[in-house]
Swiss-Prot record:
Interacts with VP3 (Potential). Interacts with VP2; this interaction activates VP1. Interacts with NSP5; this interaction is probably necessary for the formation of functional virus factories. Interacts with NSP2; this interaction is weak. This is RNA-directed RNA polymerase. GO terms for cellular component: virion component. It is found in: Virion. It comes from the Viruses. The keyword Iron-sulfur does not apply. RNA-directed RNA polymerase that is involved in both transcription and genome replication. Together with VP3 capping enzyme, forms an enzyme complex positioned near the channels situated at each of the five-fold vertices of the core. Following infection, the outermost layer of the virus is lost, leaving a double-layered particle (DLP) made up of the core and VP6 shell. VP1 then catalyzes the transcription of fully conservative plus-strand genomic RNAs that are extruded through the DLP's channels into the cytoplasm where they function as mRNAs for translation of viral proteins. Keywords: Magnesium, Nucleotide-binding, Nucleotidyltransferase, RNA-binding, RNA-directed RNA polymerase, Transferase, Viral RNA replication, Virion.
Length: 1088
């Protein structure tokens, strides 16, 4: 503890360095005598500062508080006006400002011109192309960097080099910004026309990216990469990231494999010492040299040289530098184009009649057959999900935009909103709700568009379709996904697997007579050719399925689904262009349908099968695996003879020629040793992930608060760090300080302490130790957690008013009545709460809640409420367990090879000692018998929290719960009377605890918790038969051991002597654990 608080104190003296500035620390304690001293100390501090007296004497007088109590927050006063950043910046602005080359980008507005040249008037101006979309400002970012630099100017040795590298890069940034002045943001952290008009348009987003990069510089290589990207991204806002990351798709094919991990029959990773040579035809090197040439043409010097130097040996040892370049390229920021250009890219696809009809037919048939295969069983058995598809759709209706703003009446309140869920309610109330009619999206009612921005790729468009499309597709798509879940070809959906499993799949079949074909089909998805054959394949499949059933409701579901496909074959989109709204015919597939992911995978599989069936006419091979994963597909082909350069050359050219015959603009490559797809790449038999999450620029604005964004920032930093891109932790902590501080008045600000931000309460933002989730068990920690729980849920007047209106009530009642066969308060209340929670995406409500949250927080941070909550948290459970464990030193040898080279050393060490896991631990209760029983008869999906509540009820209440959801009485009776029920109790508790302990997030998801090597460090004598207690004791012990190893790089063993008398008490407590949602858990979830 304490590192954060120390930096916080230094940061405050750095920011408020004038005479008038005062810092008042606020302490608290769970000990009532000490707590009184804390209160006295605080009031005397306020008294003294009001009278302009020094606080130094008080610090001595109240030494007991400072020594023994816990810091709660720091209150800072400053009467200084705000030109502080500019003043400090001058000191660093000693270099030559960058001059943007205004001819680099094809589109005029992507050149970094002075804003008033791009937008002559305030009316024309938009910040949408450069909006950092994050609730922190450029001035804060500059402050954070300057704070770090000032703090480290006296570093020595290796640290001094880091300081000098960063100082040098910051000089470039500071000089450029200083030339134009620091742009001031408004209250919403946006940059308005008056501020920007005389400055380069992309100044802010470029500076944010540059700061993010320079604060991630450690080595000399980092420095060279960063410098080049910082300088060039000032001018090149369009293609830089793409140019720098392109070579990777070829580099992965150049590294020999000397030992790798493969997936065995039990789906575990197993080391295999196979040696495989990378066989590379000359043509591949020509293509690579072409890419390096393009990089040099764009002004890159050092990066292409690094790649060139690596090519001499092509060793896996030096490959992490290539991985680093690949990751860094994304940190130049998002490419944000105008919607018109985003559409143009996909619409200008060259259309030709000169295509191979035979292949198209095959492609369409494969899609048709796959759709039939996926849905055959549920349709034949008149599955209840397909019968009640409308209700299922309503229950999972999102609160995203429905494409247009409407005036809605809720009781006496009239509001304007675009949200789907509100539109459904309003339509029902006004008898406009007609899910049986799918509105057309033709020239009369074109589709409004959303956008998706990614670094290094062009902006993609998203359809915002009317909610009827969602309702029509939901149930059918769910059934498709269930099929995909147990079909290994669908890497993305395959049951509880993670990326490591897919990695072992690829390496498993590689040998000297195989090659792997990998294709990026993202262009194919949006090419006009994909519309007719694709939609027709789905329609033909649905027609076949319609003949397999006589159930009117199932037929209706299939029919509505078919209608969505027919409508979308004739689709138009609307694009605002200035004041006019352009309508453009749009043939292709865009995301925004419920089926996007599933249908894309189906089409993708059909595509690669079509291509393989063609080239099998020329070459003789066996297909060992085919996988599709999002926009990518790959296949391992096995030949009768050893693979030669010539063979690769031939296969490669044939594959490309085959794709060309379908007029598919795809990037197809063939290699013997590695692949590169969007999500991961395999080189030299090792797996790599791109560490490309931007920290100081966001893709879009949502309704998350500053606290949420601080937690997301931290979470992004952790993911990047696990993937090999490390940003200075002190800088991240400084950002968290800035983003979690609360302004009381203009000159008064409150900064929460580490304890507040790291205790798992509803306010948790980060972990005091990276990769280790701590559950505080000391008196002070539990005390503050309880205090925060007292003000967890915030009310919103608007939300209450809407929820009280008949429109809302009738909607909830309607859902309950359609779903339930008899009264069931748990479910009815659950639905009402879910619907009310969906209202949070309506801005006025989230604002209102945020205000309430902040005022409660302000009170709390100045003096914790003495509140004895009776709720039990996971902390209480662990606190009960802790005293019964004794620790001793232990030793575990390193026994596994590295396969993820980018991991931080301390995490790598643990995997090398205890092994990794290739599966997700089930933490949602879906595998339990009760969950399966419910889904067999009902479309309702209870959450893990609800299952946990239900399974601990009396048996007859469980029966009633089941019967009300339409489970036949005989099944409900059988369930409660069987052994399965008691197994379920244990199983659901297990899932619930795993869920609370975030076992599938952060670096915990990489460790094998069932490793025998880990088990042997834990000794717990078996007493009595309470499996749940044994489980929690073991899990606690494993986490303790692993956390200790992450922190210290050595192992301990734990012995637990848990008294039998305590076991039953603990067991009872375990059925009353409250789950805590915080910005931190949301950020974890957000990563998914």
């Amino acid at each position: 503890m304490g590192k954060y608080n120390l930096i916080l104190s230094e940061y405050l003296s750095f920011i408020y360095n004038s005479q008038s500035a005062v810092q008042i620390p606020i302490y608290y304690s769970s000990n009532s005598e000490l707590e009184n001293r804390c209160i006295e100390f605080h009031s005397k501090c306020l008294e003294n500062s009001k009278n302009g007296l020094s606080l130094r004497k008080l610090f001595v007088e109240y030494n007991d508080v400072i020594e023994n109590a816990t810091l709660l927050s720091i209150l800072s006063y400053s009467y200084d006006k705000y030109n502080a950043v500019e003043r400090k910046l001058v000191k660093y602005a000693k270099g030559k400002p960058l001059e943007a080359d205004l001819t680099v980008n094809e589109l005029d507005y992507e050149n970094n011109k002075i804003t008033s040249e791009l937008f002559p008037t305030a009316e024309e101006y938009t910040d949408s192309l450069m909006d950092p979309a994050i609730l922190t400002s450029l001035s804060s970012n500059l402050n954070a960097v300057m704070f770090w630099l000032e703090k480290h100017e006296n570093d020595v040795a290796e640290k001094l080099k880091v300081y000098k590298r960063r100082l040098d890069l910051f000089t470039i940034v500071a000089s450029t910004i200083n030339k134009y002045g620091v742009p001031r943001h408004n209250a919403k952290y946006r940059y308005e026309y008056d501020v920007m008009k005389d400055k380069p348009y992309y100044l802010v987003t470029w500076a944010n990216s540059s700061i993010e990069m320079l604060m991630s510089v450690f080595s000399h290589d980092d420095y060279l990469i960063a410098k080049e990207l910082i300088v060039l991204s000032y001018s090149n806002r369009s293609t830089l990231a793409k140019l720098v990351s392109s070579p990777m798709s070829i580099l992965v094919a150049l590294v020999d494999i000397n030992g790798t991990f493969i997936t065995n029959e039990e789906l575990e990773l197993e080391f295999s010492n196979k040696y495989l040579r990378a066989i590379v035809p000359d043509q591949t090197f020509d293509e690579l040299n072409q890419m390096l040439d393009n990089m040099r043409k764009a002004g890159l010097v050092d990066i292409p040289k690094m790649i060139q130097d690596w090519l001499v040996d092509r060793s896996i040892e030096k490959f992490p530098l290539m991985a680093k370049i690949y990751s860094w390229s994304f940190h130049v920021g998002f490419r944000k184009q105008k919607m018109l250009d985003a559409c143009a890219g996909t619409l200008k696809t060259e259309y030709t009649e000169n295509v191979d009809d035979e292949m198209y037919r095959e492609y369409t048939m494969l899609i048709r057959d796959e759709v039939v295969k996926m849905l055959e069983e549920p349709v034949k058995h008149d599955d209840h999900l397909l019968r009640d598809s409308e209700l299922a759709g309503l229950l999972s209706m999102s609160s995203a935009s429905n494409g247009e703003s409407r005036q809605l009446k809720f009781g006496r309140k009239t509001i304007f909103s675009t949200k789907k869920n509100m539109h459904v309610m309003d339509d029902m109330a006004n008898e406009r709700y007609t899910p049986g009619i799918i509105p057309p999206v033709n020239v009369d009612k074109p589709i409004p568009l959303g956008r998706r921005d990614v670094p290094g790729r062009r902006t993609r468009i998203i359809f915002i379709l009317p909610y009827e499309y969602f309702i029509a597709q939901h149930a059918v798509v769910e059934k498709m996904l269930i099929y995909a879940k147990h079909t290994r070809e669908y890497a993305e959906f395959y049951s509880q697997s993670n990326q490591l499993l897919s990695y072992g799949d690829v390496t498993r079949f590689l040998s000297n007579n195989t090659m792997v074909l990998y294709t990026d089909v993202s262009q194919w998805d949006s090419s006009q050719h994909n519309t007719q054959p694709f939609r027709k394949g789905i329609i033909m499949g649905l027609d076949i399925l319609a003949n397999m059933t006589n159930d009117a409701k199932v037929l209706q579901t299939l029919n509505l689904y078919k209608q969505t496909q027919i409508n979308l074959m004739d689709s138009y989109v609307q694009i605002p262009d200035g004041n006019v709204i352009k309508k453009i015919q749009y043939g292709a597939v865009a995301s925004g349908e419920k089926q996007t992911k599933a249908a894309n995978s189906i089409a993708n599989l059909a595509l690669i099968k079509t291509v393989l069936s063609r080239i099998s006419n020329k070459h003789s091979f066996a297909t060992k695996i085919i996988r599709v994963d999002g926009d990518d597909n790959y296949a391992v082909l096995q030949f009768n003879t050893e693979v030669t350069k010539q063979m690769i050359q031939d296969v490669s050219n044939d594959v490309r020629e085959t794709y060309a015959r379908m007029n598919a603009k795809v990037k197809a490559l063939v290699s013997t040793v590695g692949i590169e797809i969007a999500k991961r790449y395999i080189a030299g038999g090792k797996i790599f992930f791109r560490a490309g999450i931007n920290l100081l620029n966001n893709e879009k604005r949502g309704q998350s608060t500053q606290w949420d964004q601080a937690a997301i920032l931290y979470s992004n930093y952790i993911v990047n760090r696990l993937r090999g891109f490390e940003t200075d932790r002190e800088f991240i902590l400084t950002k968290i300080m800035q983003m979690t501080s609360v302004a009381i008045t203009g000159s008064l600000r409150l900064f929460p302490s580490e304890r507040v931000l790291t205790t798992n309460s509803t306010f948790k933002v980060f972990d005091s130790e990276d990769f280790i989730i701590e559950y505080g068990t000391t008196d002070d920690e539990v005390y503050i957690q309880r205090a925060f729980m007292s003000l967890s849920s915030q009310k919103s007047g608007i939300a209450d008013e809407i929820a009280a209106s008949s429109t809302f009530k009738n909607y909830v009642t309607r859902l309950s009545e359609q779903l339930l066969f008899s009264k069931n308060n748990i479910v009815s209340r659950g639905i009402a709460l879910t619907e009310k929670a969906k209202l949070n995406s309506y801005a006025p409500i989230s604002l209102e809640k945020r205000r309430a949250q902040i005022s409660a927080l302000l009170t709390m941070l100045q003096k914790p409420v003495t509140f004895k909550s009776s709720k039990i948290t996971i902390n209480d459970i662990l606190r009960d367990i802790k005293p019964f464990f004794t620790v001793s030193d232990a030793h575990l040898p390193i026994q596994y090879q590295k396969f993820m080279p980018t991991l931080p050393d301390n995490v790598q060490y643990i995997i090398q000692c205890i092994g990794s896991r290739t599966y997700q631990i089930e933490d949602d209760g879906s595998k339990s018998a009760i969950s399966r029983l419910i889904s067999k008869y009902s479309v309702y999906k209870p959450s893990i929290e609800e299952l946990y509540k239900v399974i601990s009820l009396h048996e007859n209440e469980i029966q009633l719960y089941l019967i009300s959801l339409g489970i036949p009485k005989i099944d409900a009776d059988t369930y409660v009377g069987s052994k399965i029920y008691s197994q379920d109790k244990y199983r659901i508790l297990e899932s619930y605890v795993y869920n609370l302990l975030s076992i599938n997030y952060g670096c915990y998801q990489l460790f094998d918790f069932n490793s025998p090597d880990l088990e042997k460090l834990i000794r717990i004598p078996f007493k009595g038969k309470i499996p749940a207690v044994t489980f929690i004791l073991h899990l606690y012990a494993k986490l303790e051991v692993i956390n200790y190893a992450i922190k210290n790089g050595s192992w301990i063993s734990l012995f637990c002597n848990y008294p039998k008398s305590e076991m039953i008490k603990l067991w009872k407590k375990m059925w009353n654990i409250t789950s805590l949602r915080s910005p931190y858990t949301n950020a974890n979830f957000f990563q998914d």
